[in-house]
Amino acid sequence: MTVQKSKNPQVDIAEDNAFFPSEYSLSQYTSPVSDLDGVDYPKPYRGKHKILVIAADERYLPTDNGKLFSTGNHPIETLLPLYHLHAAGFEFEVATISGLMTKFEYWAMPHKDEKVMPFFEQHKSLFRNPKKLADVVASLNADSEYAAIFVPGGHGALIGLPESEDVAAALQWAIENDRFVISLCHGPAAFLALRHGDNPLNGYSICAFPDAADKQTPEIGYMPGHLTWYFGEELKKMGMNIINDDITGRVHKDRKVLTGDSPFAANALGKLAAQEMLAAYAG
């Protein structure tokens, strides 16, 4: 007899009234091994340009019933794109708003993946000891070595990033200076930082995690309650077009903004980003 896994969110004892996803939702949406493939870049980039990763530094996301969702950056959404970019020759730096360590959704870590886990261990210190984003922003100019800004997904991207003036300044710099902006799933919530000023992303099309899907996840205990706001609705208000209404692993390129719809798009987004950046910088 098959025992049905529980759909009740699991208690996170590190914080009051906080919860991890249910056993059932983890069985449906996580895997001990990723779908990493196609890492084939025979002529990698050899220059000085690199990636700036803007990571999440807060773990707990309040839901509508007062319960906290224990979140952060999704490991697959973070590590697979970076694996491709690193293999293509692009090093990366990590920054958070506070300068404090990156928070990961460790419950989604592909802990048996023989390629991704060594890559994570090799670069863990960058996530544990990130730069403070304000310090990075203060140093940005037309000659800065960052070729792209990458905002990983995970619900942690909903916390702080959409209101951050430093995130807005970094994105503004990237777009004005013809750099790449890469993001997926909930990461594009960071684009909301641009809504209170000049919005250079007005009219852009992207892929992102659908609001409709976020509204369904509490039913299986992925989150302990419903979100108090939905980033897709807000992105549309600031003139952005979300081209997907489902989750298929879709990726999209609009000029130099490269996006994906979910963790299922992480590998494809990594390929797309590596190919586009190699064409731009190593062509």
Swiss-Prot record:
Q: Which residues form the active site?
A: C185
Give the record's subunit note. Answer: Homodimer.
Location in the cell reads: Cytoplasm
Catalysed reactions listed for this entry: N(omega)-(1-hydroxy-2-oxopropyl)-L-arginyl-[protein] + H2O = lactate + L-arginyl-[protein] + H(+); N(6)-(1-hydroxy-2-oxopropyl)-L-lysyl-[protein] + H2O = lactate + L-lysyl-[protein] + H(+); S-(1-hydroxy-2-oxopropyl)-L-cysteinyl-[protein] + H2O = lactate + L-cysteinyl-[protein] + H(+); N(omega)-(1-hydroxy-2-oxoethyl)-L-arginyl-[protein] + H2O = L-arginyl-[protein] + glycolate + H(+)
Q: What is its main location?
A: cytoplasm
* Species in which this protein is naturally found: Escherichia coli O1:K1 / APEC
Q: Does the keyword Metal-binding apply?
A: yes
EC main class here is hydrolase
Write out the similarity annotation: Belongs to the peptidase C56 family. HchA subfamily.
Q: What is this protein called?
A: Protein/nucleic acid deglycase HchA
Positions bound to Zn(2+): H86, E91, H123
E.C. no: 3.1.2.-, 3.5.1.-, 3.5.1.124
What functional role does this protein have? Protein and nucleotide deglycase that catalyzes the deglycation of the Maillard adducts formed between amino groups of proteins or nucleotides and reactive carbonyl groups of glyoxals. Thus, functions as a protein deglycase that repairs methylglyoxal- and glyoxal-glycated proteins, and releases repaired proteins and lactate or glycolate, respectively. Deglycates cysteine, arginine and lysine residues in proteins, and thus reactivates these proteins by reversing glycation by glyoxals.
Q: Which GO terms describe its molecular function?
A: glyoxalase III activity; protein deglycase activity; thiolester hydrolase activity; zinc ion binding
